[in-house]
């Protein structure tokens, strides 16, 4: 008499969309939007393409969800840093220092996900990143305009240029100390132009 051992099938691995978005954020941040394929994403998530498209609609659909997650978890907290009870220049310097710290925090994903995404070749993805970037610029512009309306556009452009430069230098491997030195130089300019 032979005994048959019936093996019950294992429970299928559960797909967690929020975990997938976190994984995708790291992939997009470390490699850039253009360099990450749907095949890379499905492999990282452990799912097949139909499941990917059912969950996210498209690579762009996933990317927009990544940008929303980034805004909530990893973006520079402009609302907390741009305080009305402190000197304008000091708050802007704090934004730059926080940018420098965040841009080098993960050696595998340096720079700013949004600023780097604003340079991708895919037009809809680039527009999604730019929309996020423009919203951040508008917060800075509004903040500066409260005390320095005549300087708001110029200071917003200056901050955007500095943040893009910090992101590029972080991606090029510059240390936090080097980025902070640049922020200190920029801080001298900000304090001179915005003395409150």
Predicted feature locations:
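Hydrophobic alpha-helical connector segments
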Residues: 65, 78-110, 156-159
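Conserved amphipathic alpha-helical interaction elements at protein-protein interfaces in regulatory
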Residues: 26, 30, 58, 84, ...
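Amphipathic alpha-helical packing segments from all-alpha helical-bundle domains
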Residues: 75, 90, 94-97, 123-147, ...
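Amphipathic alpha-helical segments used for helix-helix packing
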Residues: 91, 104-127
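N-terminal intrinsically disordered/low-complexity leader segments
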Residues: 1-15, 194-196
